[in-house]
Amino acid sequence: MSDKKLLEEIKKRRTFAIISHPDAGKTTITEKVLLFGRALQTAGTVKGKKSGQHAKSDWMEMEKERGISVTTSVMQFPYSDHLVNLLDTPGHEDFSEDTYRTLTAVDSCLMVIDAAKGVEDRTRKLMEVTRLRDTPIVTFMNKLDRDIRDPMELLDEVETELDILCAPITWPIGCGKSFKGVYHLHRDETILYQSGHGHTIQDVRIIKGLDNPELDTAVGSDLAETLRDELELVRGASNEFDQELFREGQLTPVFFGTALGNFGVDHMLDGLVEWAPAPLGRETEEGTIESTDGKFSGFVFKIQANMDPKHRDRIAFCRIVSGKYEKGMKMRNSRLGKDVRISDALTFLAGDRSLLEEAYAGDIIGLHNHGTIRIGDTFTSGDNYRFTGIPNFAPELFKRIRLKDPLKQKQLLKGLIQLSEEGAVQVFRPLANNDLIVGAVGVLQFDVVVARLKAEYNVDALYEHVNVATARWVYSSDEKKLDEFRRKGEQNLALDGGDNLTYIAPTMVNLQLAQERYPDIQFTNTREN
């Protein structure tokens, strides 16, 4: 393949994730992004739990039951001469490491904010994660068809609380019942609101120029005057869009609209494909691999078991970092030093899978995993380097898990190890007893594990309280000191799902004392895969 063709394909791609607080409208936005990309003919409105119509991107049984996204879905669709890869992250009150790791696989993020509520807790947390790699952020202020907070106040809150400059690209005219549309600052045009629902995208009327008398007729002279006054203020007080600051993660372009009303999503998508970076390179232990490097490389950021109950399979999601995947090509798993021939990689439209002939840097492909692939694995076309920066996080919540039927211990352990390889939860086996302790970043993960053990491994399990406050992975460059620590601290030591030594502390004070007592031992709350 010519370098020119490879560069063209890579330049076309945009890979992003949506981040938001639960109920800010993230799943609806996902639907509408797909609708405007024409990937879905019917955007299934996210209904309450009783409705039979489920959102396209929520496709695991538990997600369908609860009307929430629990796992990361991957969807690819074309949009205005580009190919967009959208990674949908869990949107419920819990989220897992899955969410964090998904953010390592994207080049930009869309932040969705409920304009009636402003910046909320989950958004803060997710923004902290995007900060680790200075990911460019596009902002969508949602739910303009409801009564919202003052738009200037919202911008001010984003700037203060999330420490990022705001550059409004569109500006709302009214809200709630009197929402009339938005003014596009870059195009000097007013786009009038026509409510579209489901898969209806209304033709919109556009009025050129801010002083056009047609504007007063269309929205009413009061709203038109308010708009002109507000825009004077906006132009004086807010930031101009700056591509460089955006790419550095320091400034976010802001769009207003209503995902439910199919309005404003296309303006945001236009901005995203125009300004967001094409696939970026990634760091390895030996330096950066650029996306334009002709050789294939990629890393696994997620493993999903049993995506297809008919197939009983496990799929490893691999972000292609450089080069091109071709059906039947050989790939090397750097961790194992083994070559495998891959002829059945998958692409996804949220649970709809199809076999892939080729894929390029920025794309996400699914690899069938028969227990040999782990999160963080690097695949190359023959080199032995490994990508860095795909973390495991120390869990914050712990429970002991036990069986209703003690004869199923083997199945329980197998299920837990597989689920921990997926990154859904972490499992710890204390050195001093036969307990199995499950650690998670959020409460819902515990429910997910019990439901999946039952459905996929035919194991009935329940939880008990366990006296664990926190966990840390332990390392030392001094083998003797580590052996001594292992001997003396056995009561508090465990092995995780990958057999890594872990310190399990009953209290934070206990952890502090252990750190003081053993200065040669490193206690870390993240572990690179």
From Swiss-Prot:
It is found in: Cytoplasm. InterPro entries: EF-G-like_DII, EFG_III/V, G_TR_CS, P-loop_NTPase, PrfC, RF3_C, RF3_dom_3_sf, RF3_GTP-bd. GO terms for molecular function: GTP binding; GTPase activity; guanosine tetraphosphate binding; translation release factor activity, codon nonspecific; translation release factor activity, codon specific. PANTHER family: PEPTIDE CHAIN RELEASE FACTOR RF3. The gene is prfC. This is Peptide chain release factor 3. One of its GO terms (cellular component) is cytosol. The keyword NAD does not apply. Coiled coil: none annotated. Belongs to the TRAFAC class translation factor GTPase superfamily. Classic translation factor GTPase family. PrfC subfamily. GTP binds at residues 20-27, 88-92, 142-145. SUPFAM superfamilies: EF-G C-terminal domain-like, P-loop containing nucleoside triphosphate hydrolases, Translation proteins. Keywords: Cytoplasm, GTP-binding, Nucleotide-binding, Protein biosynthesis. It comes from Alteromonas mediterranea (strain DSM 17117 / CIP 110805 / LMG 28347 / Deep ecotype). Increases the formation of ribosomal termination complexes and stimulates activities of RF-1 and RF-2. It binds guanine nucleotides and has strong preference for UGA stop codons. It may interact directly with the ribosome. The stimulation of RF-1 and RF-2 is significantly reduced by GTP and GDP, but not by GMP. It comes from the Bacteria. Residues 11-280 form the tr-type G domain.
